[in-house]
Amino acid sequence: MNRIFYFIFALCCLVPFMDINASEVKEGNKISGHVIEDATEENIAFASILIVETGEGTMSNEEGQFTFTNLTPGKYTLRVSAVGYQTSTKEVIVSKDYIAVIHFKLKLDNIAIDEVVVSASRNEIKRWEAPVVVSVASEKLFETINAPDLAKSLNYVTGLRVENNCQNCGFPQVRINGLEGPYSQVLINSRPIISALSGVYGLEQIPVNMIERVEVVRGGGSALFGANAVGGTVNIITKDPIENSFSISTNMTNYNAKSWEQNVGANVSLVSKDKSYGIAIYENYRNRNPYDHDGDGFSELGKINLNTFGLRTFYRPTHTSRLSLEYHTTNETRRGGNKFDQQPHNSDITEQTKHIINSGGIAYDLGWKGYRNKISVFASIQHIDRSSYYGAQRDPNAYGNTDDLTWVAGATYTGQMNKCLFSPATFTGGIEYQENRLHDVIIGYNRDMRQDVKIGSAFLQNEWDMRIFSLLVGARLDKHNLIKNPIFSPRVNLLFKPNKKFQARLTYSTGFRAPQAYDEDLHVTAVGGEGVQIRLAEGLKEERSNSFSGSVDWTTSFGHWQANILLEGFYTDLKNVFILEDIGIVDNNAIKERRNGKGARVYGANLDAKIAHGSDIALQLGFTAQRSRYKVAETWTVVNNEELTTKRMMRTPDYYGYFTLTSSPVKMLDLALSGTYTGSMIVPHYAGYIENDRMETTPHFFELNFKAGYTFILHDHIKLQLNAGVQNILNSFQSDLDKGEFRDSGYFYGPTQPRTYFVGIKITQ
């Protein structure tokens, strides 16, 4: 533990010595600007203005005006963006002899084609220019669907589906293109700090009021992120201090007229007048009572009491350098089962966890030569202290404790070249080291698991920009301590972009999954009155993948309407695919074993479409058609000495999708209709409540939601919004739930909540 902190401390000590060649800043150098709407010439307030070369940013005031002061003389590129408008970029020359004045006229854009993302190449780039398809879930989406946490948001990203895998504790998991959770990598500000343990309930422990946006890359895509991201990458970008502001909100929710939930959130952002330092703070409180859908006395949605707090701060020693710090803490208690007024060991079933999570990070960015060269040094750490009870039939020995420490450190370099072989190019390279130390003890299950995962990585990529073509070639070398030989993972992306309205992409990537414990291994499912554990088979080999994808992206406008259609095809081939087989009782414990199968293929198509008429009305929908099949039928259980097999991957529908429809029929009134569709799938149903194990085929589900909000302008530009609505209006919910203490808690599928009513208040400045 001490070595880790010494290493991070050493990185921090290097920071002050890395910008000794920074140019001297002279007083009086200034940019003064004005942002207006192109069609009406009305002022645009709260537009974001960024100096591309330095990363320094500000926001326009109520009159659309902005300033930058104390700048070093030279040429700068300003990029202006605002919600609902196309991004505009202009160059300006700063001199000590005069104030540079610049004006921006922004055109309406309600389909976000100019949105800036970082997950494609770790460098800021417009979404339509990115070499891979990047989908974005923004704060606007969170409000449209009234999502309290990340788990409730990801269903509204094409190709993603969030499911609840436990009837007791509510273990959520996100699938990308049909591949289960461990195939995907969840990042916080591009850092792989989410461990297997934090992945068990992590999607519900991240409140949306800490999130600026979520960027999703389906498939391997970029070599800069882990090669274990076979399914894709979910990159959570937290809120950064940009301007002085605050917000506070509260929301009351009722589940099917039976159970209540309360959410309270607050955000504060403070920035110095010269924009050289700032801090953004968030806090969230959530309290949910257990919900029993079928009246058997056992919960379908568990009790949650959650407190989160965090901050992100920065300091700019010079205009071309930035030091960033962040800290997050979570204190959560969740419990599912029955007899909530008694101790867990006095209940028939209880799955209970108490988490204390502390994480933090530091990063130092330095640019030079007009910011055409940049180096970033970073380190992040997370510690989890979990106490748990996964037991049934009043078992006094089902208590457990888990200690989990994850840390990552590294450095990246990015350089722009006027010519590399045959065209201008951007090179990115770096090194990264991450370690996870896990100790999980449950006496009643004879479990004392220690796992130490160490991964050293080096990566590089080069992107050639040939005007209408862009070619990105990259590779990553990973040395995993649980795998004998280093793993080389190449990635290739080709982008054809004849104009801003049409892009076509081709991608090839490889990846792997190591033979280690994943999130579901650290969760004990209650089946038939006893806990079921997962163990790794002897000689388990790493899983390898080869992925291909291609897409076409077309944007058009007609009159005041804008439209965008994205069609994407994907194919992933898995070798030594991991499968779970129920092997019965071993040493008085029910065991499922993770083994290597022959292989699998996952292929299909995603459709993403948007159409908008200004801010009056906007429709967005996503739909996925896919197949997830093993190459040969794999055994999943044995009943009466007969092996039950399946060639179809479990819990993966062939068809699923979503839609959102938003409208502002009158000023200050916002209406939203949204929904998700989940097609039929197969789900294993284990004996306990039923006599023998069997495979079930689920029905189709359609979840429909409605929300209305009205905003009042109070004193001094303070806004008050009142909102209310209904989620899952049709009460589309699983109808064949197991009941009682012998139920299979893993037999849980479909929408994650019943018909739900909510009302909320939000105050912002």
Where are these regions (language model features)?
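Short, acidic, small-residue-rich periplasmic hinge/interaction motif at the N-terminus
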Residues: 36-40, 47-52, 81-85, 95-143, ...
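Short acidic/polar hinge/loop motifs at secondary-structure boundaries
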Residues: 69, 173-175, 191-218, 239
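Extracytoplasmic beta-strand/coil segments of soluble accessory domains associated
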Residues: 151-192, 212
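Membrane-embedded beta-barrel scaffold of Gram-negative outer-membrane proteins
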Residues: 266-268, 376-390, 505, 539-595, ...
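Gram-negative outer-membrane beta-barrel transporters
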Residues: 465-470, 570-573, 593-686, 762
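C-terminal beta-signal and adjacent terminal beta-strands/loops
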Residues: 575, 677-686, 710-765
